[in-house]
Structures are given as structure tokens and as C-alpha cells.
Amino acid sequence: MTDHTNDSSDKNGKLLYCSFCGKSQHEVRKLIAGPSVFICDECVDLCNDIIREEIQESASEGSSDKLPKPHEISAILDQYVIGQKRAKKVLAVAVYNHYKRLRFGDKTAKDKEPVELGKSNILLVGPTGSGKTLLAETLARLLDVPFTIADATTLTEAGYVGEDVENIIQKLLQKCDYDVEKAQQGIVYIDEIDKISRKSDNPSITRDVSGEGVQQALLKLIEGTIASVPPQGGRKHPQQEFLQVDTSNILFICGGAFAGLDKVIRDRSEKGGIGFAAEVKSKDDKRNFGETLHDLEPEDLVRYGLIPEFVGRLPVIATLDELDKAALIQILTEPKNALTKQYGKLFEMEGVQIDFRPDALDAVAERALERKTGARGLRSIMESVLLDTMYRIPSEEHVVKVVVDELVIKGESEPLLVYEQVEKPPKAASAED
């Protein structure tokens, strides 16, 4: 039924027309009058659609401008992670291409011959404490996307005690207050991925629910599927309405130390021989774990225990080097959140300056190398060395500086406390005077 208001007819009863489309007041639902002009409800809707599309286009253009270039991503990673130049380059290109694919995917779909861009998930391989998790965390913070870390060792096949692989997506949803659209553009880091390698090359009568079984369960999730996730999680609330999350645009980064992988690589790459055909090598020719990883091929991961289908879902492989003494000293001092800067800020809150002598930093790096835990061991060393000092300082008066040298790190002396000079009050005059 046509709805006319007093605005859609003049005082003389003359038939009115829309000034934009030319339709009469009887052909439209509503005609709105302005100063000597009229507009119908259909033209208003059309204007709203045009404005809405322009806003969306400008928003998408603005968001694409905010996407940092690969060299910018690498430069920002340099501020937080020391070394690992090649790994940063691989990550920067992979992440840039992934989010470029998301932001321009709709435009390529309108082409005469649309090209579907595949997703490039990432595998980080490197020794403990080399910066795998920190790289993933820094990327997510840089791109301002939801980020979650999952531990592969806690995952099991559905129906067994442990976490389902869908719980990973639920954790991602929790990070963005169950905003499905945001979660679908997030980053998931699966740590300890090497711990779910197949236990044996030979088929077994017992089911490997935490190894190959988990790899099988992760296949579709990583490649892209519609995951059904309960808002409150788990199997305890089957009556809840499930959220449908498309994982095809979620970037999965898997990381692991892969202890023993260097031997697998050497067995493949180093040709053996007998007698005069044998290749002679000195002990000095033996490369360390990180250097050996540079020759990593997908087939080595399969021999290590990852199933071929799972390796195929992780086309981008970045290897990280072992951290040497010089790199550990840099980690202590150079990054934005370097440990020496963190402890400096803690002591500054008490009005005290802390001074780490160069020989102290050298000794900390030496102890970390002995522990073979990479950069992860640096904080525990610093905590144990500074524990007593941090216990005393809040109660001590007039302390202005703490000096830490090599002997302190080795446990042979205590940190040197420097006090401010306090003037003693003059003695009161005696009664005899």
C-alpha cells in the first residue's frame, strides 16, 4: 500500500514527482519534500547503498595502506629479536603475502580469469631459545591481529583424554571476545610440533593418539575448514549453539626444536663410501645444529616422523640458527625489551640505578651457553643473581646505585651498593657552653 505524507503533495493538490528518478508520488512508497525538490524512498535507499560501498572501499584501501612491506616487517622484528636474518626474511615475505591475499582476495575474484591464491602456513625449525615464539608474538603484535599459542603436546585425537584440536580455535576466539570475523584473520602458533611426530615408521597395533593421530586431526584445520566451536569450550556443554569459524584465512605457524633432525639431514646429504671412495673429513668440518638446518628438505621432516600430508600443509619453512655468545650479549642489551633495560626500569622505580659491567654480561652469556637453553636461560640467571639485591633495596635507605660485575655473576661476591652522602646534623650545644 502506498504511503503518502503531507510532504508528498502540495497545497494545490498537484501531482508531485521525485526530482532524481522522475517517478510520481503514486509510484513510490514515500516522497520527501525539500525546498523546491523532492526525493523518493527508493532514491534514498540507493544513496545509502552508494555511500556504504564507498565507505567500505575507502576502509579497505586504508587497511591495505597499513599493511607493512616485507622490509618494514623485518626491520620491526629486528627491534625485538636478535640475529636470525634469513628466518626474518622468510617470515616477512610469507606474512605479507598472506595478508595481501586476504585484503585483495575479493578484487581478484572479480577478474575475468580469477586466480585462487593458496595459503602459506609456516614451519619454524630451530634450537630451544632461538626466538621462534618471540618472532610469532611480535608478528601478531605488529599486525594487530588476534594471536594464541597452543602446545602440541597436550593435543589428542577427538574422543581421548586431552585437548581437541578445535580447542585451539576456541582459544583464538577468547582472545578477541568471540568476534568470529576477527578470529578468522588471526595467527595461531602451535609450539612443540616436533613432539607429535610419528613414534615409529612401522605400523603398530596400538593407536598413536598423541602423535600421528594429532597430525591427521590438524590437517583440515590448518588447510582450511569450517570448525564448530562451542563458546564455553569442551565437551561439557553439548546443548550450546556452536560457532562456525572458517580457518582458511587463519595463519598457522608451527614451531619446534626437532632434536636429532641434524642427523637425519646428514644421513641424506653426506655421501658415504668405502675405501678410496670414502669422503675424508676432519673434526673441524662438523657443522653445528643451526648450520645443518640450512640444508633442510621436506623429505627430512617426513623421515623425522611428520606425515607427508602434514608437511605439505606447511610450505614455508624457516630455520633458525643457534645463538652464540655474541648474540646472547646483544639480546641482553639491544632489543627494546632487553633484560638489562627491564631490570633497569624495575630498579628505577625504587629510585636506584643499576649498572651491568661488560664482564658481567659476558659471564651471563657464558652460563646460558653452558645450560644449552638459548636466550630462554638468560632471565633465570639474572633472577637468581639479583634476587637478594631486589629483596634488600626496598628496605634500604639512601641507595643510589647497584653495580654488577663478573664476580657477582659467578657467585663469588655480592653486588656493590652505592649510597648517597648524607650530611649529619650538627651536635647540640652542651649546657656548660
Swiss-Prot record:
<keyword id="KW-0143">Chaperone</keyword>
<dbReference type="InterPro" id="IPR027417">
    <property type="entry name" value="P-loop_NTPase"/>
</dbReference>
<dbReference type="InterPro" id="IPR046425">
    <property type="entry name" value="ClpX_bact"/>
</dbReference>
<keyword id="KW-0862">Zinc</keyword>
<dbReference type="GO" id="GO:0051603">
    <property type="term" value="P:proteolysis involved in protein catabolic process"/>
</dbReference>
<dbReference type="InterPro" id="IPR038366">
    <property type="entry name" value="Znf_CppX_C4_sf"/>
</dbReference>
<dbReference type="GO" id="GO:0140662">
    <property type="term" value="F:ATP-dependent protein folding chaperone"/>
</dbReference>
<comment type="subunit">
    <text>Component of the ClpX-ClpP complex. Forms a hexameric ring that, in the presence of ATP, binds to fourteen ClpP subunits assembled into a disk-like structure with a central cavity, resembling the structure of eukaryotic proteasomes.</text>
</comment>
<feature type="binding site">
    <location>
        <begin position="127"/>
        <end position="134"/>
    </location>
    <ligand>
        <name>ATP</name>
    </ligand>
</feature>
<dbReference type="GO" id="GO:0046983">
    <property type="term" value="F:protein dimerization activity"/>
</dbReference>
<comment type="function">
    <text>ATP-dependent specificity component of the Clp protease. It directs the protease to specific substrates. Can perform chaperone functions in the absence of ClpP.</text>
</comment>
<feature type="binding site">
    <location>
        <position position="43"/>
    </location>
    <ligand>
        <name>Zn(2+)</name>
    </ligand>
</feature>
<dbReference type="InterPro" id="IPR003959">
    <property type="entry name" value="ATPase_AAA_core"/>
</dbReference>
<dbReference type="InterPro" id="IPR004487">
    <property type="entry name" value="Clp_protease_ATP-bd_su_ClpX"/>
</dbReference>
<feature type="binding site">
    <location>
        <position position="18"/>
    </location>
    <ligand>
        <name>Zn(2+)</name>
    </ligand>
</feature>
<dbReference type="Pfam" id="PF06689">
    <property type="entry name" value="zf-C4_ClpX"/>
</dbReference>
<feature type="binding site">
    <location>
        <position position="21"/>
    </location>
    <ligand>
        <name>Zn(2+)</name>
    </ligand>
</feature>
<dbReference type="GO" id="GO:0051082">
    <property type="term" value="F:unfolded protein binding"/>
</dbReference>
<dbReference type="InterPro" id="IPR003593">
    <property type="entry name" value="AAA+_ATPase"/>
</dbReference>
<comment type="similarity">
    <text>Belongs to the ClpX chaperone family.</text>
</comment>
<keyword id="KW-0479">Metal-binding</keyword>
<dbReference type="GO" id="GO:0016887">
    <property type="term" value="F:ATP hydrolysis activity"/>
</dbReference>
<dbReference type="InterPro" id="IPR019489">
    <property type="entry name" value="Clp_ATPase_C"/>
</dbReference>
<dbReference type="InterPro" id="IPR010603">
    <property type="entry name" value="Znf_CppX_C4"/>
</dbReference>
<dbReference type="GO" id="GO:0008270">
    <property type="term" value="F:zinc ion binding"/>
</dbReference>
<dbReference type="Pfam" id="PF07724">
    <property type="entry name" value="AAA_2"/>
</dbReference>
<dbReference type="InterPro" id="IPR050052">
    <property type="entry name" value="ATP-dep_Clp_protease_ClpX"/>
</dbReference>
<dbReference type="GO" id="GO:0051301">
    <property type="term" value="P:cell division"/>
</dbReference>
<feature type="binding site">
    <location>
        <position position="40"/>
    </location>
    <ligand>
        <name>Zn(2+)</name>
    </ligand>
</feature>
<keyword id="KW-0547">Nucleotide-binding</keyword>
<keyword id="KW-0067">ATP-binding</keyword>
<dbReference type="GO" id="GO:0005524">
    <property type="term" value="F:ATP binding"/>
</dbReference>
<feature type="domain" description="ClpX-type ZB">
    <location>
        <begin position="5"/>
        <end position="59"/>
    </location>
</feature>
<dbReference type="Pfam" id="PF10431">
    <property type="entry name" value="ClpB_D2-small"/>
</dbReference>
<dbReference type="GO" id="GO:0009376">
    <property type="term" value="C:HslUV protease complex"/>
</dbReference>
<protein>
    <recommendedName>
        <fullName>ATP-dependent Clp protease ATP-binding subunit ClpX</fullName>
    </recommendedName>
</protein>
